[in-house]
Amino acid sequence: MTALKNSFNRLGCVLLGAFLSGSALAQTPDVQVTEPGFKVFQFPKNQIPRIDGSFADWDVVPDRHVVPIEEMWDDSRKHQGINKSTLDIKVKVGWVEGLNRLYFYYEAYDDFWDFNTLGLRNDTYEIVVDADLSGGPHIDQFRHNQEALTRFESFFLHQNVHAQNYHIMTPPTEGKSWTMVWGPQQWLKDLPYANYAYDYNFKHGEDGVLKFEFYITPFDYASPDGGPAASTESKLYEGKKIGLCWAVIDYDGGPGNNGFWNLSKHHKMYGNASMQRLFTLMPLEAQFRKPIEAKW
């Protein structure tokens, strides 16, 4: 009798285990922004980057804060690995206490700079920011309740509202805006919420190095129809963790792109803030603190 009871117990455990395993397999785990992440350098208040195209202000940023192309991958799978003789990228990100701005320094070498049309087709640095880690979809294509809301309705309700996407032209064709804000909040790309400066010496189809600095202002709520007055800036402070990601869309003269170099392992990070990378707003470096602060 005891042996029979033990057999039933073992059978029950097996069936329960199979049920739980099947349930777990049937559920797709939610993607999340997790460690390991990257560091956002804190500029001293008397060394705020001047957006002037000289870039000397960025010399104080240590190399450990640089995000190189080695952190990215071509998720279009046109390239099996990194070849710096055709494309090389490095990015620095900074912030300043008291200003709700994210500063960027972008430097890239390309063997074929593509920027001769007025359409969206352009060598592009695409960035997405979710400064309160609210996560989830923020473009109409990935909207919830797709049976109730059309893409058109969702665009004017949700697009770029809790996380923002910028398609930055590197560099822009003459006559074209420096960035496409992917939503109705076009004021995001203008002063005082953004500014930019480029430096390059090449023409379309040539190789060379582009240097570019800019800042943007992240918003926890960027009103789709009420403008800045109806919107809520993200509050930036020391130690805060934010969602941030980027991709480089490389064109080389052909009909389509020649690579989508992504900082995220998820291709759809451009429209789902849960697929971004984690960035932490760092304290001042020791040499910029007062002596008592450095000891503390």
Model-identified regions with their sequence ranges:
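Structural preference for beta-rich elements and adjacent junctions enriched in aromatics
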Residues: 27-296
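Bacterial N-terminal signal peptides that target proteins for export
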Residues: 2-15
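Conserved, single-site charged/polar hotspot
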Residues: 18
